[in-house]
């Protein structure tokens, strides 16, 4: 494989991992803010909100993990 294609693979993997990480960071920030807002409004629902918070945070955090796997696949398997 010539070096231009290899360079494009590295750049595409970096873009995939970078945008997924930025998106997850923004999503977790918004999620945390909404959790605090909901907990401040109705303190008696904190256990329910906390459970839902951690479930959704796990789903949001899974996206960058998948993109890291795809990025590593692009770097090592496709080159």
Swiss-Prot record:
The chain crosses the membrane at residues 11-31, 55-75. Keywords: ATP synthesis, Cell membrane, CF(0), Hydrogen ion transport, Ion transport, Lipid-binding, Membrane, Transmembrane, Transmembrane helix, Transport. SUPFAM superfamilies: F1F0 ATP synthase subunit C (SSF81333). GO terms for molecular function: lipid binding; proton-transporting ATP synthase activity, rotational mechanism. The record marks 61 as: Reversibly protonated during proton transport. The keyword Cell membrane applies. F-type ATPases have 2 components, F(1) - the catalytic core - and F(0) - the membrane proton channel. F(1) has five subunits: alpha(3), beta(3), gamma(1), delta(1), epsilon(1). F(0) has three main subunits: a(1), b(2) and c(10-14). The alpha and beta chains form an alternating ring which encloses part of the gamma chain. F(1) is attached to F(0) by a central stalk formed by the gamma and epsilon chains, while a peripheral stalk is formed by the delta and b chains. It is a multi-pass membrane protein. It is found in: Cell membrane. One of its GO terms (cellular component) is proton-transporting ATP synthase complex. CDD domains: ATP-synt_Fo_c_ATPE. This is ATP synthase subunit c. Belongs to the ATPase C chain family. F(1)F(0) ATP synthase produces ATP from ADP in the presence of a proton or sodium gradient. F-type ATPases consist of two structural domains, F(1) containing the extramembraneous catalytic core and F(0) containing the membrane proton channel, linked together by a central stalk and a peripheral stalk. During catalysis, ATP synthesis in the catalytic domain of F(1) is coupled via a rotary mechanism of the central stalk subunits to proton translocation. Signal peptide: none annotated. It holds the Pfam family ATP-synt_C.
